């Protein structure tokens, strides 16, 4: 099954009923009113007893700055034309490979830089100063490199700040998409149906979506449904295994696939209702080291941890 977003005016009564498969919502948009606040709180909580405490606190400062930038720099767009075009082409409406960026993302970056400068250590201030002095052309090249996963083209010290601005920009746009999501037969469920990016991790929900697994986009923050008995990367079902650092009851596990040799974190709200897709993934890097030691490659990217040059 693949997921496609359809404009509301193209949904008749019959197709409206068909926007979910077995009453399963195929797509969940982020609640921006609480997303960054919740992520900040979770990062701060996880930092209390973690060998990566300093970096988790650093990430929390970035998410706090994202929350402020979201409030200070709202974005209002008419997404009808983009949605109609994407529905006709079968492409994600905010396809990161072709969607024309405006200067709004650079305004967000400037706001993040200004906010983070206040109490940042000297080595971070130096990075922020370099970004602040960069030309529009340079910043757009950095953005292109990150979105195209050409990480050698941008220093890993700059990447989290550029991505934080891009992600907030894409999340703001995604929150204004007026269509409905519909599950259809097809492939490529490893990519976000909203923007075409990849997941940071997956979350097994409680509440209304109890027991359902959703992949969380590392760019636009949307979540899309993928069944739990299928590899989120290659869609095979033959050789899936689950790994944890603690016990079988651990809230954070890694789902590995013997077919494609990759793994993705899977977070269980039933075990810990406070798990958060980005924060808990970042705080469990020891599990990543274990998976790499077992010969598996990570199929996702955390927005605070990009591959080095």
From Swiss-Prot:
Q: State the Gene Ontology BP annotations.
A: protein maturation
Gene Ontology MF, one: ferric iron binding
Looking at the keywords, is Phosphoprotein present? no
Gene Ontology, cellular component aspect: cytosol
InterPro entries per record: FdhE-like_sf (IPR024064), FdhE_C (IPR056796), FdhE_central (IPR056797), FdhE_N (IPR056774), Formate_DH_accessory (IPR006452)
Alphabetized, the UniProt keywords read: Cytoplasm
Compartments, as annotated in UniProt:
Cytoplasm
Stretch forming the signal peptide = none
This chain's function reads: Necessary for formate dehydrogenase activity.
UniProt lists the family membership as follows:
Belongs to the FdhE family.
Name the UniProt record assigns to this protein: Protein FdhE homolog
